[in-house]
């Protein structure tokens, strides 16, 4: 009998041992840390032009030793960084995820407001009350949090609040962004940790002030900059990040200086070290926003020494960031992805200076003319309630009161808008929302960029070379190209250098990350994993 039980015990032990070996051999391999690098204003052309000036461990390490998605295009219309980032992180488009731009026209109060504004939240260190409530789908960061509840740690360090919230999604442990009035890290009560202790310490111990007050001068002799080849009298520049943007403004130029990037790297590394990101087999994620914008920027191209210097200094910051991550976590255990926003190579100003048709579309005067036209047709009333982001909002209440045919009024506005300089097309919203067929067409991109909750009644598009500007002459979106490409790189972990020439869309990024991390795709994802460099079945 003893021999019988002994045999059973040995048999069970044997199969348990074999099962354990099999489980170990089939265990899913994941990167321990995912680092997302979003660079506002990044252009592939700039990376190529400045390649010879970069250090080997910064941009070059990512671009030369990583995976280059050569033909990655945006399948949405450019309407601001919020929409671009939300599309990257959700693998979906505004038609589903709801983030149609940095701002939108709120029909309830007839105001243009930030896409992240939320009066139900509280600001921490700021009067700004923001949340991700208008982001209607989950992100890849959210799915990571849900896949490993209370284990996966996720943080965001950003320059701007809109970018911070879109990178953080709904479930980031903490996000922080720069307050460029009071010069400190701030956040929103929407995220469970509030202002993380590392950011708070930088505010209190003077670490933020030290970095944010660095005088910005050229990194090298001014004659060595590309801009000097076009201007032999080019003078060295000097900026103080605490100086005001304009005479009557309380806002500083901090966010458009290298100091902003230094602050992001410093806090990001503090979080990685003190929160022990990447220390175990449960993947963690940190998203970082940088910029290559300069004070008072008018051009998208490399026409200034300041623009070059932003790139050169950011290159050194990225080199330091990667070196520290390699020391603390190991780049072989870290997946890095780097991307920019939609932006044209040349601004309308540059195109115009070279006799290429281009211009800026300003809504204020245009909407006044549209209203005058409708008054001539239907009577002396306020027929237009608002406009933003190529969306025209009609006074539905007044149209109903006058018992007018709504579609007839819509069509009248469409017909009139076609006479405006810079306008390519004008369509009733119901027509745009019903567009089907070729997903690569211009109208499909327009449909992708509209959400029923925030859409106007008439939607216009602009001619090539034209950009919309708001009442302060700030661009609403930065690209009007029919097909908009953006640099995108993956680096680190198990990836080998590769150039992927297969056409992909930006909605394919989130499912690719999900596949690498072996987690569910975001719940509104319409993209597909990029198979060229993902090894999972």
Predicted regions, residues:
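Bacterial Sec-dependent N-terminal signal peptides
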Residues: 1-29
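Active-site-proximal N-terminal segment of extracellular/periplasmic enzymes that hydrolyze or transfer
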Residues: 24-67
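Second-shell loop/turn segments in exported
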Residues: 43-49, 72-74, 126-132, 251-258, ...
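Secreted, luminal/periplasmic, and some membrane-associated catalytic domains
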Residues: 54, 80, 102-129, 137, ...
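Short, solvent-exposed turn/loop segments enriched in Gly/Ser/Thr/Pro and often Arg
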Residues: 69-89, 156-164, 289-291, 335, ...
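His/Asp/Glu-rich, glycine-adjacent segments
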Residues: 92-93, 101-282, 291-298, 421-425
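Substrate-binding rim/cap in mid-to-C-terminal beta-strand-loop elements of soluble/periplasmic
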Residues: 364-405, 475-517, 531-536
């Amino acid at each position: 009998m003893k021999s019988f039980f002994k045999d059973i015990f040995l048999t069970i032990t044997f199969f348990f041992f074999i099962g354990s070996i099999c489980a170990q051999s089939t265990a899913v391999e994941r990167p321990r840390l995912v680092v997302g690098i979003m660079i506002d204003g990044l252009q592939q052309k700039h990376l190529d032009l400045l390649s010879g000036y970069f250090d080997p461990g910064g941009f070059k390490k990512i671009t030369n030793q990583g995976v280059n998605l050569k033909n990655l295009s945006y399948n949405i219309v450019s309407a601001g960084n919020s929409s671009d980032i939300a599309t990257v992180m959700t693998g979906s488009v505004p038609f589903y995820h709801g983030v149609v731009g940095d701002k939108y026209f709120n029909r309830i109060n007839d105001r243009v407001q930030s896409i992240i504004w939320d009066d139900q939240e509280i600001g921490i260190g700021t009067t700004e009350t923001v949340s991700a409530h208008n982001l209607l789908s989950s992100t890849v960061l959210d799915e990571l949090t849900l896949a490993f509840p209370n284990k996966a740690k996720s943080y965001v360090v950003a320059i701007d609040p809109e970018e911070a919230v879109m990178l953080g999604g709904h479930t980031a442990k903490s996000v922080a962004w720069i307050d460029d009035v009071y010069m400190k890290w701030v956040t929103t009560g929407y995220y469970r940790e509030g202002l993380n202790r590392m950011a708070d310490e930088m505010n209190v111990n003077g670490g933020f002030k030290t970095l944010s007050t660095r005088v910005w001068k050229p990194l090298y002799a001014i004659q060595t900059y590309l801009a000097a080849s076009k201007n032999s009298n080019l003078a060295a520049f000097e900026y103080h990040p605490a100086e005001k943007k304009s005479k009557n403004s309380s806002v500083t130029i901090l966010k458009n200086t290298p100091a902003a990037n230094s602050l992001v790297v410093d806090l990001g590394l503090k979080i990685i070290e003190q929160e022990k990101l990447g220390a175990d087999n449960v993947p963690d994620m940190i998203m970082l926003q940088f910029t290559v914008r300069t004070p008072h920027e008018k051009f998208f191209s490399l026409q200034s020494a300041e623009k070059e210097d932003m790139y050169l200094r950011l290159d050194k910051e990225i080199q330091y960031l990667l070196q520290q991550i390699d020391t603390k976590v190991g780049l072989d255990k870290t997946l890095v992805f780097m991307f920019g926003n939609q932006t044209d190579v040349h601004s309308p100003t540059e195109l115009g200076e070279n006799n290429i048709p281009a211009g800026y579309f300003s809504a204020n005067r245009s909407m006044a003319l549209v209203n005058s036209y409708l008054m001539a047709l239907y009577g002396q009333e306020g027929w237009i309630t608002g406009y933003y982001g190529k969306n025209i909002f009609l006074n539905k209440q007044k149209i109903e009161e006058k018992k007018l045919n709504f579609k007839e009024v819509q069509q009248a506005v469409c017909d009139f808008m076609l006479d405006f300089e810079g306008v390519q097309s004008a369509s009733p919203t119901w027509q745009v929302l019903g567009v089907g067929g070729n997903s690569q067409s211009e109208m499909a991109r327009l449909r992708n960029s509209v959400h029923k909750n925030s859409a106007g009644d008439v939607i216009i598009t602009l001619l090539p070379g034209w950009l919309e500007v708001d009442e302060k002459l700030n661009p609403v979106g930065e690209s009007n190209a029919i097909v908009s490409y953006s640099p995108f790189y993956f680096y680190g972990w198990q990836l080998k250098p590769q150039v992927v020439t297969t056409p992909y869309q930006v909605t394919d990024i989130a499912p690719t990350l999900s596949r690498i991390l072996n987690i569910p795709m975001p719940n509104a994802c319409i993209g597909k994993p990029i198979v060229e460099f993902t090894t999972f079945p």
